[in-house]
């Protein structure tokens, strides 16, 4: 399960070049976290869209491992060109702070750094299957963009300006 995360050895999230969180061995880390936080029926809905289905055995034999069979059927069944796949991984699956962070971030550059790993751990296959290769041709990052109405935007600018001035005054009065 969780095979896509095994394609990377490190994933880092940064705001304006300031590292917020870095996950080493995201395959193992997100698998352990997912086992603790996702209910057993998670794979029947949203989980399968991120290739999350629990294995029932340690083998890649469809007759023995129903989790492996479900993932394989999902990949093959998708209406895409043979040999291609597409999945959605929410940031909260990777980074712990995303689970409960609900603030709007204004004026910062967001950076997601993915360091690729070999395919050895990412491809779960039977002993009879040949070694595969995963080529990542494109990764898309969807970030919600809030564009408030003009009046709300003006109020937000005033609030930000007031807080910046207060912060600057605190810094100048420090002795």
Show where each model-derived region lies.
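Flexible assembly/topogenesis modules
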Residues: 1-175
């Amino acid at each position: 399960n969780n095979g896509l995360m095994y394609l990377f050895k490190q994933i880092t999230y940064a705001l304006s070049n300031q590292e917020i969180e870095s996950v080493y061995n995201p395959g193992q880390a997100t698998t352990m976290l997912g086992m603790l936080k996702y209910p057993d029926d998670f794979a029947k809905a949203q989980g399968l869209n991120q290739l999350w289905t629990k294995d029932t055995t340690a083998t890649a034999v469809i007759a023995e491992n129903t989790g492996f069979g479900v993932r394989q059927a999902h990949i093959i069944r998708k209406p895409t060109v043979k040999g291609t796949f597409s999945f959605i991984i929410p940031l909260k699956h990777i980074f712990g702070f995303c689970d409960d962070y609900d603030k709007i971030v204004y004026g910062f550059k967001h950076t997601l750094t993915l360091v690729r790993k070999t395919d050895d751990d990412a491809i779960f296959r039977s002993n009879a299957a040949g070694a595969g290769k995963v080529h990542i041709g494109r990764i898309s990052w969807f970030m919600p963009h809030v564009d408030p109405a003009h009046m709300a935007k003006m109020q937000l600018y005033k609030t930000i300006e007031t807080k910046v001035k207060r912060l600057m005054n605190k810094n100048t009065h420090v002795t």
